[in-house]
Structure formats: C-alpha cells, structure tokens
Amino acid sequence: MKNGTVKWFNADKGYGFITGEDGNDVFVHFSAIQTDGFKTLEEGQKVTFDEESSDRGPQAANVVPQ
C-alpha cells in the first residue's frame, strides 16, 4: 500500500487524481474507493492505495480514505 493525498476528485464524473508520496499523480475511479455508501473523495484528503498499471498510465486500486 502507498500513501497519498487527493489532488482533486469530481464526484459528478466519478474520477480524479491522487498525488503519491513520490510526487507522481495517479488516476482514481470511484469504483476503487473502499467505503460503504456514496464513494467520493475530498481534495487534500489522505488515502492509502495500491498502484496498478493501465493502458493510460498508473491507476489507483483499493483506495482507503484515512
């Protein structure tokens, strides 16, 4: 698991970006958020996540808000 901070997240569109501790931005889709109910993130929120490779670059998986 990696630590990161939500750079931005658009709840209407269901995606955004997390900035990892290494300074790299990672795409996050709402389906990767591990919470009950409405899955959203807030700018500046701390999260842990797994990083996976996709056709479009790094993508977050198993995102857990802190």
Curated annotation (Swiss-Prot):
Keywords attached to this entry: Activator, Cytoplasm, DNA-binding, Stress response, Transcription, Transcription regulation
Gene3D superfamilies assigned: 6.20.370.130, Nucleic acid-binding proteins
Domain CSD per the UniProt entry, residue ranges: 4-63
Primary site of residence: cytoplasm
GO cellular component: cytoplasm
Region (Disordered): 47-66
Induction: In response to low temperature.
Recorded GO MF terms: DNA binding
Name under which the protein is recorded: Cold shock protein 1
Lineage, uppermost ranks: Bacteria, Bacillati, Bacillota, Bacilli, Lactobacillales
